[in-house]
């Protein structure tokens, strides 16, 4: 899959799927998570997210895009930075995300930087 590096508001990207740096709990976090929830329609996305429960670090899951101009939101539960071991976890997040992308035949994706803080 070819790629481009674009600096833009991820909620305004015209792609099939955007990736969210998700909270492990069904709450709206800061940064990218907050921006995506608000652009998608906070109440609808949060209600859907509540049905899924809690997740662990490196878990990934798809939700509908709701009011966003994308079909899917791929939520990646990114780790908190805790030194060198975090590098392997971030790598695992990207691997898990690309596995879901491939399994769902998603052709265009916008990624934020994962585990960089809000």
Predicted regions span which residues?
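Macrodomain-like recognition of ADP-ribose-binding/processing modules
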Residues: 1-118
């Amino acid at each position: 899959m070819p790629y481009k590096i674009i600096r833009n508001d991820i909620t305004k990207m015209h792609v099939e799927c955007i990736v969210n740096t998700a909270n492990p709990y069904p709450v709206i976090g800061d940064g990218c998570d907050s921006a995506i929830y608000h652009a998608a329609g906070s109440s609808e996305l949060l209600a859907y997210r509540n049905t899924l429960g809690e997740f662990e670090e490196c878990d990934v899951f798809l939700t509908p895009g709701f009011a966003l101009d994308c079909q899917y939101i791929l939520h990646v539960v990114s780790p908190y930075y805790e030194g060198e071991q975090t590098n392997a976890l971030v790598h695992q997040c990207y691997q898990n995300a690309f596995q879901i992308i491939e399994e769902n035949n998603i052709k265009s994706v916008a990624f934020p930087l994962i585990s960089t803080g809000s």
